[in-house]
């Protein structure tokens, strides 16, 4: 059993976003004394800026372990949402509203169905919607679409509310959050992580977890190569209507629309490698708004509530880094790119298992050994 210290904290988690906060909750529930260090405000970065799509099926174009993890994590949200309502009285906006991906031509619709057909053989729902039915189901969509493929078990959550609820639950369970704290390095002595160095000294702990998102590779000693996890800027536009224009999350060529029950619609997104430049750009907005009005021309009359951008932790091989970092008592939980909200429940369970029991699946596509460096 690892992750216990005779004094101070058993676990220090670097990063107070969704990954760090949910890992803190699970470890605190297991009796660990947990400190979460966040350079800004917990949840202020990519976690709260995400659209919150639970695309366990719709983002999976091929079979394999990553698909299985995605569906597992999506299904964990059923219990997680109920747990948070009970623990802190907050509805995190979990809705199994489904995702539909539209096709512009019959040929594209056939190809889209072939892309997802393998999921049916694994027992998952995949539905083909012809043009006439699509106009009845989602009348606001462009009437020129040839149809769509529906993944009715995918859904959404509201990320800012989710992060707030999890942080509150973690604090009630005994975890400590410290905002405005930049971690410079992991303190390693004789091949064992002993804590972290911050701007005003050191913090000792029995175990260190790196969950700093796009900033993870900047923590010295975290064993994460700069090429393994890097920032990918994503811009989002939030529209406002009197009523939701769609029942489901809608994917189209080059973008998506996420309808909230209160009439807000989150539209995205861009993928830009510009370092940590957080600007919202004319080009980015033009791309998003062009895509969204192509999906539903009536949205051209919607009010623009706000725009923002943030940085997803992009992993160049498409898989996160979760588990054993190759140094004793050091765990990684980063590199989830745009699936961080979806994959947080599965990640937190694996972090808990590694910290408490030392377990990391050597065959997992998330095993950090493929991408870490000393």
Where do the PLM segments sit?
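Helix-loop-beta segment of a Rossmann-like dinucleotide-binding subdomain
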Residues: 90-103, 115-116, 127-173, 270-274, ...
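N-terminal Rossmann-like FAD-binding beta1-loop-alpha1 element of flavoenzymes
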Residues: 9-35
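Helical element adjacent to the flavin cofactor pocket in flavoenzyme catalytic cores
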Residues: 149-207
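Dinucleotide-binding Rossmann-like beta1-alpha1 core, especially the glycine-rich loop
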Residues: 52-133, 137, 291-293
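Conserved Rossmann-like nucleotide-cofactor binding loop
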Residues: 19, 42, 215
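Active-site substrate-recognition segment that forms the wall
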Residues: 25-30, 39, 52-54, 90-95, ...
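C-terminal catalytic lobe of FAD-dependent flavoproteins
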Residues: 159, 296-374
């Amino acid at each position: 059993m690892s992750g216990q210290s005779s004094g101070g904290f058993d676990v220090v988690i670097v990063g107070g976003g969704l990954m760090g906060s949910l890992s803190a909750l699970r470890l605190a529930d297991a009796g660990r004394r947990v400190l979460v260090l966040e350079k800004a405000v917990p949840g202020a970065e990519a976690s709260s800026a995400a659209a919150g799509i639970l695309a366990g099926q719709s983002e999976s174009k091929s079979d394999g372990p990553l698909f299985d993890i995605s569906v597992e994590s999506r299904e964990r949200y059923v219990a997680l949402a109920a747990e948070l309502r009970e623990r802190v009285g907050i509805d995190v906006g979990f809705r199994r509203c489904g995702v539909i991906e539209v096709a512009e031509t019959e040929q594209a619709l056939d190809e889209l169905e072939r892309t997802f057909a393998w999921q049916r053989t694994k027992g998952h729902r995949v539905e083909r919607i012809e043009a006439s039915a699509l106009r009845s189901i989602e009348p606001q969509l462009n009437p020129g679409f040839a149809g769509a493929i529906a993944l009715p078990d995918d859904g959404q959550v509201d990320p800012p509310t989710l992060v707030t609820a999890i942080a509150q639950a973690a604090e009630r369970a005994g975890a400590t959050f410290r905002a405005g704290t930049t971690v410079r390095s992991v303190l390693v002595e004789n091949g064992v992580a002993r804590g972290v160095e911050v701007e005003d000294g050191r913090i000792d702990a029995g175990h260190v977890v790196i969950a700093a998102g796009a900033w993870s590779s900047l923590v010295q000693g975290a064993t994460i190569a700069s090429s393994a996890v890097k920032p990918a800027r994503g811009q989002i536009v939030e529209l406002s209507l009197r009523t939701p224009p769609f029942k489901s999350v809608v994917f189209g060529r080059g973008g998506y629309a996420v309808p909230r029950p209160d009439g807000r619609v989150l539209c995205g997104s861009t993928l830009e490698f510009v370092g940590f430049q957080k600007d919202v750009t004319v080009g980015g907005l033009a791309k998003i708004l062009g895509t969204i009005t192509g999906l539903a021309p009536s949205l051209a009359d919607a009010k623009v509530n706000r725009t923002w951008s943030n940085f997803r932790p992009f992993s160049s091989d498409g898989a996160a880094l979760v588990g054993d970092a190759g140094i004793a008592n050091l765990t990684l939980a980063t590199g989830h790119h745009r699936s961080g909200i979806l994959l947080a429940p599965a990640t937190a369970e694996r972090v808990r298992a590694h910290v408490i029991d030392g377990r990391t699946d050597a065959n997992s596509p998330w095993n950090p050994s493929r991408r870490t460096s000393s």
